[in-house]
From Swiss-Prot:
It holds the Pfam family Ribosomal_L5_C. Keywords: Ribonucleoprotein, Ribosomal protein, RNA-binding, rRNA-binding, tRNA-binding. GO terms for molecular function: rRNA binding; structural constituent of ribosome; tRNA binding. The gene is rplE. This is Large ribosomal subunit protein uL5. It comes from Burkholderia multivorans (strain ATCC 17616 / 249). This is one of the proteins that bind and probably mediate the attachment of the 5S RNA into the large ribosomal subunit, where it forms part of the central protuberance. In the 70S ribosome it contacts protein S13 of the 30S subunit (bridge B1b), connecting the 2 subunits; this bridge is implicated in subunit movement. Contacts the P site tRNA; the 5S rRNA and some of its associated proteins might help stabilize positioning of ribosome-bound tRNAs. The keyword Ion transport does not apply.
Length: 179
């Protein structure tokens, strides 16, 4: 069992029950999945970009991402339907908790001028999104071997019904909120 998973069961669940007054353990919000998405519009010109991005996401997530394709053609962006334009990976279970652990303890503190993540990035339904500008904040990525700096979106999906519950859940995982 992952370190954060044990921490969730032993410390987070009792803390949230006390704070929000849940009657059942099953009411306590939990993280269901973490989705990493890398949009690569520049991949239209060069197919190598997709391969490099897939390699980077594989190292970061620990599992192979799926290449996302354009749903419809957009002439202004020179994209045809079916063109590979991104990569995404969904983490659940043990891999999800291990990634969250690495994100909070190692990766986020490596961001330049890091003061904490925004507490306003919730979607109104208890899910949280973080945009990362550079993939080199993850220790798995070797700075000398990357071809370009690419950003990615990290989406944390929870079972929380409100943003306050989700923020309390993530804060109990030592998420560094600045507000």
């Amino acid at each position: 069992m992952a370190r954060l998973q044990e921490f969730y069961k032993e410390k987070v669940v009792p803390g949230l029950i006390e704070k929000f007054g849940y009657k059942s353990v099953m009411e306590v919000p939990r993280i269901t999945k973490i989705t990493l998405n890398m949009g690569l519009g520049e991949a239209v010109a060069d197919k190598k970009i997709i391969e490099n991005a897939v390699g980077d996401l594989t190292k970061i997530a620990g599992q192979k991402p799926v290449v996302t394709k354009a749903r419809k053609a957009i002439a202004g962006f020179k994209i045809r339907q079916g063109y590979p334009i991104g990569a995404m990976v969904t983490l659940r279970g043990r891999a999800m908790y291990e990634f969250l652990d690495r994100l909070v303890t190692v990766a986020l503190p490596r961001v330049r001028d890091f003061r904490g993540v925004s507490g306003r990035a919730f979607d109104g339904r208890g899910n949280y999104n973080i945009g990362v500008k550079e993939q080199i904040i993850f220790p798995e990525i070797d700075y000398d071997k990357i071809d370009a700096l690419r950003g990615l979106n990290i989406s944390i999906t929870t079972t929380a019904k409100t943003d306050d519950e989700a923020k309390a859940l993530l804060a109990s995982f030592k998420f560094p909120f600045r507000n």
